Amino acid sequence: MSIRKTGIVFQRFGKQFKVFVENQTLVAFAQKKLQWKRDFKLLVGDKVTLENGVIVAVEERKNTLVRPKVVNVDQVVIVQSLIEPKINWQQLFKLLIHFHAQNVARLVLVITKNDLEFEPAEKARLSELTSFGYQLFFTAPNADLPLTLFTELQNRFSVFMGQSGVGKSSLINRLDSQIHQAIQALSAHQFGKNTTTSTVMFPFQNGFICDTPGFNVIDFPNLKQLAAQHFVGFASLIGQCHFSNCTHQSEKGCFIVSAVTQKSYSLWLYESYLKLIN
């Protein structure tokens, strides 16, 4: 008699998959017909059906991230520092564009190393982002983590990602001491060394946390086209542009350019958009 169960893929190694099933961890193989499907690969976050320890079906995905390669994400937690390493706004905007385009419902920004001195203008820019619905938290090594951060993570599949050296793995360890991640100090050149080498998922407060490899530079396909639709704050404005394919530069009837002129949309954000696409 076959026994069918449902679970979530949380790690892949070779042709084997680790799957959370009823609060247990099972090691499973994918059925051959799944392996033979063209351009299909099981990914961390896939909701699967197992039959006698073999993955026989995969549920339709609600979203698919390119970097990291994770699916069915409820929210992304972008971990960033303002200094050591200095915040890279262009990289942050690229991430926000990608996640908006992939219909990630919630985006959370966690700023680490808040005990270090940094330019007040940088903090003001971050606060400006909260007006567009992003959740913002500040943390420091010797201070307790905000309780509201724990609340944000409950009952959700949260993917953590960030530039190398910002303290992403250290933050996860503080959230749950049982999630042990290797930590390395910043290199002499102020670039962090990746402490996470693969995408891994952990149970956390009735949800999951997914740690991902750090990065120094990251790019996504079709970024310019996606930016015109998904840049910060554009969603409520682009429908009022005269042309549906408006790139928000010099086109006649661009509502975003008009909003910048009338100071109802941030000049700093608009200039950041132009820098990104040009």
From Swiss-Prot:
SUPFAM superfamilies: P-loop containing nucleoside triphosphate hydrolases. Zn(2+) binds at C241, C246, H248, C254. One of its GO terms (biological process) is ribosomal small subunit biogenesis. Residues 62-218 form the CP-type G domain. Its cofactor is Zn(2+). GTP binds at T112, K113, N114, D115, G162, Q163, S164, G165, V166, G167, K168, S169, S170. Gene3D superfamilies: P-loop containing nucleotide triphosphate hydrolases, Probable gtpase engc, domain 3. One of several proteins that assist in the late maturation steps of the functional core of the 30S ribosomal subunit. Helps release RbfA from mature subunits. May play a role in the assembly of ribosomal proteins into the subunit. Circularly permuted GTPase that catalyzes slow GTP hydrolysis, GTPase activity is stimulated by the 30S ribosomal subunit. This is Small ribosomal subunit biogenesis GTPase RsgA.
